[in-house]
Amino acid sequence: MSFQLTLFSMLFLLIAVVVGQPIQSQNGDLKMQAVQDNSPLNMEAFNDDSALYDYLEQSDPSLKSMEKRWANQVRFGKRASWASSVRFG
């Protein structure tokens, strides 16, 4: 009885280890895989690319001033809520 229980638990452990293995892709680079599939897999693959943010700032230089103006309106202007007026005075 004890031998059968040990054998059963070893078999169960082996199945759990095999099923629980993460799926390994042949190509570990997500960028390469996304280019080959011609579809973005996950944005984590492209997070290290700062060219997109540089492009946005260069294409519209008023973007930063517009963001700053919007933030001031949210804090002190017509979009200010009761909580922001309490917080910022």
Swiss-Prot record:
Tissue and organ distribution: Each flp gene is expressed in a distinct set of neurons. Flp-19 is expressed in the URX interneurons, the serotonin and acetylcholine-expressing HSN neurons, and the AIN, AWA and BAG neurons.
UniProt family annotation: Belongs to the FARP (FMRFamide related peptide) family.
GO BP terms in the entry: neuropeptide signaling pathway
Cell compartments where the protein resides: Secreted
Protein role: FMRFamides and FMRFamide-like peptides are neuropeptides. WANQVRF-amide inhibits the activity of dissected pharyngeal myogenic muscle system.
Signal peptide: 1-20
UniProt-recorded name of the protein: FMRFamide-like neuropeptides 19
A GO CC term attached to the entry: extracellular region
Keywords per UniProt: Amidation, Cleavage on pair of basic residues, Neuropeptide, Secreted, Signal
Phenylalanine amide: modified positions: 76
Propeptide residues per the UniProt entry: 21-67, 80-89
